Amino acid sequence: FNSTSSKNLIYPVPDLISHAASAYLFRNLTSKLKVCQQQFFILVLLGVFLPDLIARGSAFLDREIFLAAQYFHTPFACFFQTVVISCFFVKSQKAPVFWALTTGWILHQAFDIMQGVLGPGYYFILWPLSNQSVSFGLFPDSAWYCVAFLTTLAAFLTNKSLIKKIKAKIS
């Protein structure tokens, strides 16, 4: 792939904003879940970035390993990364940490699979069962600015403390 397309793959700022906003939106809609409580929510945020940490981060080190590193972006690899990270916590926290991270990377994968694929296709959701990239193509890759805006707006509009402040101002 050429440097122009790889540049688009490496610096997906609206993509990262959408992932972070999806975590906040999830927390706002399911605030009673343990993974959405303050002490574990930071791990949901880490989880939404987990697939890109190695997969996209590798491009900064060496563009030649970028394609091979995409396998760290798969649910299969994310599962094992989550297991390893969870092992560093005390026994009583391992399960909530695992579920918080897993919630994050599932949100990430869900957003990624909905978009049209950049370049030849890098979402190997079914790996190691299949080497075919998968995309539902619900919105084109060029729509990430709109998706980032709409996801962030939805996260703000579902924020309970913001809703209380707005209701107080109106009353």
Regions found by a protein language model. Name each.
Residues 1-171:
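N-terminal membrane-targeting hydrophobic helices
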